[in-house]
C-alpha cells in the first residue's frame, strides 16, 4: 500500500482526478458543439488552460493563488482572442475552408477584446507585484520592476499579430 507524506494527499489526488475528468469532458463538449459558439469558444479554450493550472498546482500540493488564477484567465483569454484575430488576418485575400465560428467574429471586436484582456492581465500582474501578501512572501517590494517586461511581452505579441501576421 502506498503511503503519503501529507494527510491531505488523497484529497489532493481526488481533486486532480476531478479536474482532469472535467478537462476531458470540456474538450469533448468543445469538439462536438461549443467550438461553433462565438465568444464561448475562446472561453472554453481558456477554461481548459485554467483547469491545467489548477491540476498542476494541486498536483504538487499547493493551493493556486487568486493572483495566479486572475492573471492566468486574462492571459489565456488574451491569447485566445488574439489567435482568432490571427485566423481572420490569414483569411484576408484567401478563400477556402476555415472555422465556421470565424464568420461571426469581427476584426474590430477582436481588437477590443484583446485590448481588454491585455489590460486586465497587465493590471492584475501589476497589483500582484505590490500586494502585501506578495511582498511578504518574497521579502521584497521590488517585483514591481518586472512589470515593464510583462508589458513589453504583451505589446510585442500585439505587434507581431498586427504587423507581421503572427499570432
Please name every model-derived segment.
Residues 14-16, 35-38:
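Membrane-interface helix-loop-helix modules in multi-pass inner-membrane proteins
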Residues 26, 40, 155:
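Single, functionally critical "micro-switch" positions that shape active/binding sites
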Residues 3-11:
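Short, small-residue-biased leader/transition segments that mark boundaries at the very start
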Amino acid at each position: 500500500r502506498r503511503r503519503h507524506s501529507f494527510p491531505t494527499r488523497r484529497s489532493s489526488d481526488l481533486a486532480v482526478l476531478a479536474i482532469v475528468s472535467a478537462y476531458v469532458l470540456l474538450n469533448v463538449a468543445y469538439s462536438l458543439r461549443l467550438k461553433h459558439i462565438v465568444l464561448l469558444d475562446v472561453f472554453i479554450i481558456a477554461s481548459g488552460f485554467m483547469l491545467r493550472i489548477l491540476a498542476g498546482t494541486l498536483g504538487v500540493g499547493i493551493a493556486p493563488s487568486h493572483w495566479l488564477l486572475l492573471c492566468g484567465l486574462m492571459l489565456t483569454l488574451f491569447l485566445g482572442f488574439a489567435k482568432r484575430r490571427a485566423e481572420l488576418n490569414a483569411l484576408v485575400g484567401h478563400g477556402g475552408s476555415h472555422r465556421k465560428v470565424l464568420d461571426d467574429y469581427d476584426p474590430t471586436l477582436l481588437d477590443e477584446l484583446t485590448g481588454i484582456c491585455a489590460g486586465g492581465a497587465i493590471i492584475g500582474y501589476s497589483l500582484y507585484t505590490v500586494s502585501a501578501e506578495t511582498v511578504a512572501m518574497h521579502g521584497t517590494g521590488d517585483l514591481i520592476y518586472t512589470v515593464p517586461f510583462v508589458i513589453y511581452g504583451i505589446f510585442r505579441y500585439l505587434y507581431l499579430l498586427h504587423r507581421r501576421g503572427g499570432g
